[in-house]
Design a protein with these regions (language model features):
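Short loop/turn microsegments at loop-to-beta-strand junctions
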Residues: 10-11, 34, 141-143
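A short acidic/small-residue loop/turn micro-motif
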Residues: 30, 159-163, 168
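Short beta-strand/turn micro-motifs composed of small residues
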Residues: 38, 68, 148
C-alpha cells in the first residue's frame, strides 16, 4: 500500500453513497474537496468526529465526501436525521479489502493515533456517544485528504479528524 502525499494525483473512484446516489471523484474537478476516511459508525470516537465534520462542513463550505466501513444499512440509519449535506459512502469490502482505503494508503492506527483515540474517547463519552455494533477493521486509522480543483492532493493527514488544524490549513490556502 502506497502512502499518498501532497502533490500526488488523487486516485479516482465511483461509489454509491447511502444518501446522495453515485459519487465520482472526477465530477468534483474544478472544486476543492475534502475526502474523509472514517472507521465505522459504531465507534464512539467516529461518532464524535462525524458531528465535528458536519459542523465543519457547514462553516467552511468545502465539498466533503465521507468514507466509512459500516454496512450501508448501518450508515444510512446512523446519519438519518442528522442533516448531513454531503455524501456518505459505505465502502464495499472486496475480497476482504476496502479498496479505496488501500488506494489512498489509509491503513492501521499508528501508536500516536492510538493515544489520541483514547483521549478522544473520553470526549466522546462526555458527549454521550456509546459504542454500537463492530464493523470494518477495528485497527483502521481515520484520515483526511484535501484535493485541489485539478485532482491533486494538497493535504494528506492520517489520524483523527482535527477541524481546528484543517480550518487553519484551508485559510492558509486562501
Amino acid at each position: 500500500m502506497v502512502k499518498l502525499r501532497p502533490g500526488d494525483t488523487a486516485p479516482g473512484f465511483s461509489l454509491d453513497s447511502v444518501n446522495m446516489g453515485r459519487v465520482t471523484l472526477g465530477e468534483y474537478r474544478g472544486r476543492r474537496v475534502l475526502l474523509v476516511f472514517g472507521r465505522y459508525f459504531g465507534c464512539p470516537v467516529c461518532q464524535y468526529d462525524f458531528d465535528q465534520l458536519i459542523k465543519f462542513s457547514g462553516e467552511t463550505g468545502i465539498d466533503v465526501i465521507y468514507m466509512v466501513q459500516s454496512r450501508p444499512e448501518s450508515a444510512a440509519e446512523y446519519i438519518g436525521g442528522l442533516g448531513v449535506d454531503f455524501p456518505v459512502v459505505a465502502v464495499p469490502v472486496e475480497n476482504g479489502r476496502y479498496r479505496v482505503y488501500d488506494a489512498y494508503g489509509v491503513g492501521a492506527l499508528g501508536a500516536a493515533s492510538v493515544i489520541q483515540m483514547f483521549r478522544r474517547a473520553r470526549d466522546a463519552r462526555r458527549a454521550g456517544k456509546v459504542h454500537g455494533p463492530y464493523e470494518g477493521r477495528e485497527t483502521q486509522s481515520p484520515a483526511d485528504f484535501v484535493v485541489d480543483v485539478d485532482g491533486v492532493i494538497l493535504r494528506a493527514h492520517v489520524g483523527l479528524f482535527d477541524p481546528v488544524e484543517l480550518t487553519a490549513f484551508l485559510r492558509d490556502l486562501g
